[in-house]
Structure formats: structure tokens, C-alpha cells
Amino acid sequence: MSAAAAPAPERGWKSEKVDEAQALARSCAARRPDFQPCDGLSICATHSHGKCFKLHWCCHLGWCHCKYVYQPMTPVEQLPSTEIPAKPREPANTIQISVSLTEHFLKFASVFQPPLPPDSPRYCMISDLFIDNYQVKCINGKMCYVQKQPAPHSHKMSPEEVSAHDAFISKESNTPKIDHCSSPSSSEDSGINAIGAHYVESCDEDTEEGAELSSEEDYSPESSWEPDECTLLSPSQSDLEVIETIETTV
């Protein structure tokens, strides 16, 4: 008897839970009249994922669970639509701008010319930045700048030019010579011949200072400038010796 009586209280407990769940579902559904109870035939996604994707609702014990209530989407066929006329009933007072601009462009297309190509970049040589009016001369083991002699004129000078040239030579001979390898304090251009005089001293004489610079015991970076022979460098060679290591961006 006890075994048969046991299922009765269990069924009563389940029925109470069902009534409670249904009452909760009814109160929830009362606020959403668009929801309907599950018909028991459709498979509702709420049972597996907790979401209902149907227009009807269903969940635990066949009624809506307030936790998973979603607004259904409006069917496409119920959306408002606008009728599109097949042909305009009356001519519109508008023009197609693209067609008008195209016609206007084709009328004047022959007048248009392509833009001029940009000028190619101009590069300058580093030697062009310096005035090549001097020569590099080795005197007593030192590299000195000596002004170049002017190029001889091919045309014959008039008597007036000859007299003026002779007067200039006599004046130049009376001018005292300045040491062209002097220090910057005694010459404004620090070694460059300032008065334009042409020096013809021989390089055969070696002073004690030149001997000291050429000795192997007291070697210094300046001694690397001393040539083996005392020669008169041409302007092109002087550019290589003096200007080769200069990097300039123009």
C-alpha cells in the first residue's frame, strides 16, 4: 500500500508546479497579446537554446517563460510598398546633367591641351660652385694657392691700351710682395693671394721647416699632403686635391 500511495503525493507536487508555471506564463502572455500558446506540434527552439524563433511562443510546461520573450519580426508581405509608375504621365521640367555636360565637353574637347610636363631637375657640378682662378703650388713643402695668370688676348692692343698696361706693370713692380703662405692674421683670405700678383719663386729651396715635416720620426697627418716632387698642379688637379672630399646638396 505504501508503494502505491507514494506516487500520489509526487503527482500532486508536479501538478502544483505546472499550475504555478502556467499561471506565470499566463500573466506574462497577458502583457503580450501577439504571443500565443504553443500548439504542441511545432518544435520550439526555447527547449534547447532558450530562444524562440517562431511567431508562437512555447517553453517549459507548454507555456511562455517570461525570461525568453522576443518581439516577432514583421512579415515582408505586410510591409508598406510604393507603386512605381511605368511611364511618366507628363513631361518633367528637368534635364539629365551628365548628358548635358558630356555634350558641352565634346564641343570644346579639341581646344583642351594636356598640361606641359614638369621641368626636369637641374643638377650642378660641384666644381661649378667655385671660381677656378687659382692654382695650387707646392712651396717649401706647403700647399699654397696662387692666382692664375690671365689668358693672353689674341687681338692686338691699341696704343692707349699698351700705355695703360705698361703703367700697371710699373705700379705692380713697385708693390711689395707678401708671403702667400702667411698666417690668417696677416692675410684676409688665409693663404690665397690677395693682391693678384704672380709668384715665380722656385720650389727647389727646402727650409728647415719643410725638412721637419718630411721626417719619419715626427709623422703627422699634415705630412701626407707633401708631394714627392715639387710640381705646379693644374686647376683640374687642384679640384681633385681640394674639392674632392666636399659634399654639397643644392
UniProtKB/Swiss-Prot annotation:
Entry annotated with the keyword Plastid: no
UniProt KW Kinase keyword: no
Record's keyword terms, sorted: Neurogenesis
Region (Disordered): 201-250
Pfam families: UPF0524 (PF15823)
One biological process term in Gene Ontology: circadian behavior
InterPro entries (alphabetical): UPF0524_fam (IPR029670)
Biased composition (Acidic residues): 202-229
Family affiliation: Belongs to the UPF0524 family.
Role summary: May play a role in neuronal and neurobehavioral development.
Protein name: UPF0524 protein C3orf70 homolog
Organism: Bos taurus (Bovine)
Taxonomic lineage: Eukaryota, Metazoa, Chordata, Craniata, Vertebrata
